[in-house]
């Protein structure tokens, strides 16, 4: 049986967290520097525990004003301290709640920069490994970040997107382009099924490119998020695809 993980970001101030946790298998818990606070983080962890959803930390650059979406150049020691601070906070709240923090998925600009920057990717991998070498690193499928993480001995989770278009090299179409997003639910569902069942993804030039899909990111913001997640879950079930974090 084919299997796939569904992940969603939590504790970012969206009203859909509890509903989405009934539909996904992994939760990326905001660490408080791009959104959220200690109480929202604690609540998200408890809700995830209640729904038997795998928990990961979702650290960012210290950029609350721009929701962690601004590229930043921090000294290595400062960025490491920033990451230790965030991972330590979520791990401690998980421990206090009787659950395990199992993986790390960088957020926003940190995620996108590390996907292409070997030095930044290595810094993230070293920090994650120092916190707990059993932690997995979730990142863009086929990216430098995952390659570097594996070189550092970390297990990785290859993430793909239901609502993003892809270039011929397997990278995401930049958000600055008008065709970055998949706006139509039918197209998004078709793309998800192709990635899971065939191991390829359509590209904006009309072709297809091979892609490894361990986990699908479902964006949780917006009123449509729960409706879309419900439909994705139903379509996967109808195709005999098991939704699970045990990838």
From Swiss-Prot:
Forms a complex composed of PxpA, PxpB and PxpC. It is an enzyme of class 3 (hydrolase). SUPFAM superfamilies: Glycoside hydrolase/deacetylase. It holds the Pfam family LamB_YcsF. Keywords: ATP-binding, Hydrolase, Nucleotide-binding. Catalyzes the cleavage of 5-oxoproline to form L-glutamate coupled to the hydrolysis of ATP to ADP and inorganic phosphate. It comes from Histophilus somni (strain 2336). InterPro entries: Glyco_hydro/deAcase_b/a-brl (IPR011330), LamB/YcsF/PxpA-like (IPR005501). It catalyses: 5-oxo-L-proline + ATP + 2 H2O = L-glutamate + ADP + phosphate + H(+). GO terms for biological process: carbohydrate metabolic process. It comes from the Bacteria. Its EC number is 3.5.2.9. This is 5-oxoprolinase subunit A. Belongs to the LamB/PxpA family. GO terms for molecular function: 5-oxoprolinase (ATP-hydrolyzing) activity; ATP binding.
């Amino acid at each position: 049986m084919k299997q796939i993980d569904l992940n969603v970001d939590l504790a970012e101030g969206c009203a859909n967290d509890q509903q989405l946790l009934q539909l996904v298998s992994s939760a990326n818990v905001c660490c408080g520097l791009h959104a959220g606070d200690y109480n929202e983080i604690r609540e998200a962890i408890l809700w995830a525990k209640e729904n038997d959803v795998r928990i990961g930390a979702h650290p960012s650059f210290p950029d609350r004003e721009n929701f962690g979406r601004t590229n930043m150049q921090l000294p290595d020691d400062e960025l490491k301290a920033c990451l230790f601070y965030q991972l330590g906070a979520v791990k401690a709240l998980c421990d206090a709640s009787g659950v395990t923090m199992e993986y790390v998925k960088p957020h926003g600009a940190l995620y996108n920069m590390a996907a292409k920057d070997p030095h930044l990717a290595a810094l993230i991998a070293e920090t994650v490994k120092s916190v707990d070498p059993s932690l997995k690193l979730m990142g863009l499928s086929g990216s430098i970040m995952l390659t570097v993480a594996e070189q550092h001995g970390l297990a990785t989770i290859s993430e793909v997107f239901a609502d993003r278009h892809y270039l011929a090299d397997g990278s995401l179409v930049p958000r600055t382009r008008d065709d970055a997003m998949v706006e139509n639910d039918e197209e998004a569902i078709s793309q998800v099924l192709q990635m899971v069942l065939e191991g390829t993804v359509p590209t904006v030039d009309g072709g297809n490119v091979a892609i490894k899909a361990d986990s699908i990111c479902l964006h949780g913001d917006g009123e449509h998020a729960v409706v879309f997640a419900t439909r994705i879950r139903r379509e996967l079930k109808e195709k005999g695809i098991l939704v699970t974090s045990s990838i």
